[in-house]
Amino acid sequence: AGKEIEKTNAENRKRIKNSFMRSNMDIEIEREYSSVLNGFSVEANYGDLQAIKETEGVKNAFVESFYKKIEPVENSMLTTGSVPAIGGDIVGGDFGYTGKSSVVAIIDSGLDASHEAFASVNNPKYTMEDIAEIAANSKLTIGTLAVSAVYKSEKIPYAYDYADVDTNVSGGDSHGTHVAGIVGANSGGVVQGVAPDTQFLIMKVFGDSAAGAYDTDILSALDDAVKLGADAINMSLGTPGGFSEDSAKTMREVYNRVENAGIGLYCAAGNEYSAPYQGASGNNLPLADNPDYGIVGSPSTYSAAVSVASMNNMKSTSPYFLLGEQQIRYNDAAEEKSGQLVSLSGSYAYVDCGEGAAADFEGKDVKGKIALIRRGGEENGEPLSFMQKEEHAKNAGAVAAIIYDNVDGALVSMATGGLIPCVFINKSDGERMCSAADKTVQISETFIGRFSDDYSGKMSDFSSWGTTQDLQIKPEITAPGGDIYSTLPGGLYGSMSGTSMASPHMAGAAAVMDQYIREEQDGLNIPQTDKNKLSHALMMSTALPLKDENGNLYSPRKQGAGLVQLDKAVTTGAYLLN
């Protein structure tokens, strides 16, 4: 029956394409879809949209949407501890559930496939021969391309750049590599993902120089993910306040087909705080005549997708310098070691330089020393930027700048010009440095420590609020996303924050649950389509509701069911199912 349906669908697509060719419309077929959608993408004049819709056999036509990567909100502290926070260390260490024989499709900006953290996997689901067999029997986007071109390694049996139409998936930014590390890095003591033994289908939908991704490429990736038998899909991309116009019905059907194929679809909820954030009220609260908080992003708003909110990590592993015996942790914005504070290494005097305006350096000897600067201030009637402070410090002869916050709060990132090493510390540490009798600090690349603060284990303030515009409860569940340490291109490691980091925790968790259900529940003969539903129900039923600093539960519109708890999901004796 399936082959007959596939044949009929192909004939219908051919009939419509022939109708286009006979028309006066200037239409070029770009991609065909056959698993999540019976259709194709075309390049055509906008003025022909209605005529395309009225073509016999066409159910719908719409202008494709543009999705942005859900960018990290701050690149603050180097972190560990997110996997233990969701019980991943217990299910891996005590039960042996590490995502064996599972595969996760990562629809993102690509991957550094040569990174040491993606070198090995135990009990892989797919070999190159398996991928070749699927390609021979399914119409993948790669067409007649040799499978050896998309098979990168045992860990990465399939990788393709849908945006640039080539096999180079490493040309994008660091976003996709960081996301993949959270799902399933396996680099021993440096970084271990939630499912270290899962395989990756790397589906690059962001062009090397593009700021976002288009439906054309996302649909191709989803279509292939279904054909390739993904157990879970991660999509850390979206648009705020998700709801679309003509595309809504069709895209809803697409995501429903992904779900009906037994694949868990995990999407970032978004980093847009709430609808009234920085709005007309002036206090980040909604007006009485417009009480809507919801700004959770699409595609996480579709009912078939799981919308994932972000919690701040439990522990942060951060670089620090010494003020006497006091450890002062900091955030270094520089990506290259040569531009980081640790490039100085040794004992350095520092000078209090106020807010870092040019006038603040007058009469002060900072040559060969570090400038200590307070955040904020003005110069010539305009706010002082971090880059201006850095420039003034360099011009005065400083070898580095330490900028401290002017308000209490978590460490944030700052934009710098790379003129001299610049790091950011919190307000209390900056004030301690100002009042210290001995204004000398010790710097070393070996100074790495573990810290927690008042924000650890709390919901990330940036994590987008629900509900959706049609009042669905979104997000559904929470995972660590604030200050997550993971893989970066070039064999490096570093931290990012955002729901983009929370969603892959869930995709990795789904791979772990897939192994658990396959090994422990096979006697029940659960169909693949129902395995995903059982996995979702177990994780939702055992999630831990989170409380704020006052001991009050966060709203489900902020955290969904709560923090995923893998160790509870694989040991619970009961669960809820809707």
Residue ranges and their predicted role:
Residues 1-71:
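Inhibitory N-terminal propeptides of secreted protease zymogens
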Residues 29-32, 41-51, 70-123, 160-175, ...:
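N-terminal domain-start motif of subtilase-like serine proteases
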Residues 92-214, 228-231, 259-260, 275-277, ...:
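Subtilisin-like serine protease catalytic core
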Residues 116-126, 135-148, 167, 264-265, ...:
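Structured lumen-facing ectodomains of secretory-pathway proteins
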Residues 180-183, 201-207, 231, 376, ...:
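Hydrolase catalytic cores
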Residues 222-245, 268-269, 368-377:
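Short acidic, glycine-rich surface-loop motifs adjacent to enzyme active sites
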Residues 234, 307, 412, 418-436, ...:
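C-terminal subdomain of the subtilisin-like protease fold in secreted/lumenal serine endopeptidases
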Residues 247-265:
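Catalytic-core regions built around general acid/base machinery
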